[in-house]
Each structure stands twice: as C-alpha cells, then as structure tokens.
Amino acid sequence: MALNSLSLSLQFGKFPDAALHRAALPRHSVARWIRHALQSDAEITVRIVGAEEGQALNRDYRAKDYATNVLTFDYTQAPYVTADLVLCAPVVAKEAQDNQKTLQAHYAHLLVHGTLHAQGYDHETGEEDAEEMEALEIEILAGLGFDNPYR
C-alpha cells in the first residue's frame, strides 16, 4: 500500500516531564502513524503541550474550560489536508496510566484519531459516525502493531 505524503512539523511546548514525552514521540514514528491514517497528502503540525496551554486552547476554541487529550484544527481537507493537532501531555499520560496502555500506544491512537478528524471524520455527530471512526482507528492501529484502544 502506497502511503500519502506528509509534511510534518513536530513541536514541544514547555511542561514538566517533556523529555519523557519526547522519547515516546520520535519524529519517524509520529510521521508513520499519521501517514497510515491519511487518505490524502497532508501538511500537519503536531504540538505537544502542557496543561495550561491545553486548557487555554480548549477554552478559547471549544468553550470547554479544561485540558483535553487532543484538539484538531482542520483548515483544508481532500485533496490536500492541512491541520494542527494539539496533544496535552499530562492528560495523555494520565489516560495511558489509567487505561494500562503505554504512553507511545496512547499517543499513536490519539494521533490517528486527530488525523481522522482532520479529514472530516466526527464521532460526535451520531452513533453510526462514531462506529465508523472507531472501526477505522482499530484497523489502522492494528496495521501499526497496536492493540484495540477501545478494550
């Protein structure tokens, strides 16, 4: 299977334990995970942030005053995807621990999830859409060697 091309910018904000998160997110792995979820060529920025920045972005853009695991800002979709994915490191770490997943496996899931959002998939529009998106995530992650994230 030929993968779509990806122009990737990987950024890390300033937050506690940043080195741990950098170690879980080598650039080649991040690019691989995203490329497997792409249905078009893309330019994507991935930014890993602390709780304060994550909360501010969620509050300012979604009117939800708490830090969430991943935010997707999609600017264009097919035939060329342009998007920013913002992942909140402390939330991702807590969820990984609570669900007994490795940090890397949870990041892979959230990057696939965010990339699907950037292409127009939405799990909040109805049960059928949520099932379609989850099935795609499971299939993509299995192809990458990760377990079903919903178990």
UniProtKB/Swiss-Prot annotation:
Main location, first listed in the record: cytoplasm
Protein localization: Cytoplasm
The protein's enzyme class: hydrolase
Binding residues annotated for Zn(2+), in chain numbering: 113, 117, 123
GO biological process, one term: rRNA processing
InterPro entries: MetalPrtase_cat_dom_sf_prd, YbeY, YbeY_CS
SUPFAM superfamilies for this protein: Metalloproteases ('zincins'), catalytic domain
Keywords, in A-Z order: Cytoplasm, Endonuclease, Hydrolase, Metal-binding, Nuclease, Ribosome biogenesis, rRNA processing, Zinc
Cofactor note: Binds 1 zinc ion.
EC code(s) of this entry: 3.1.-.-
Cofactor needs: Zn(2+)
Similarity comment: family membership: Belongs to the endoribonuclease YbeY family.
Function (record text): Single strand-specific metallo-endoribonuclease involved in late-stage 70S ribosome quality control and in maturation of the 3' terminus of the 16S rRNA.
HAMAP family tied to this protein: Endoribonucl_YbeY
Name by which UniProt lists this protein: Endoribonuclease YbeY
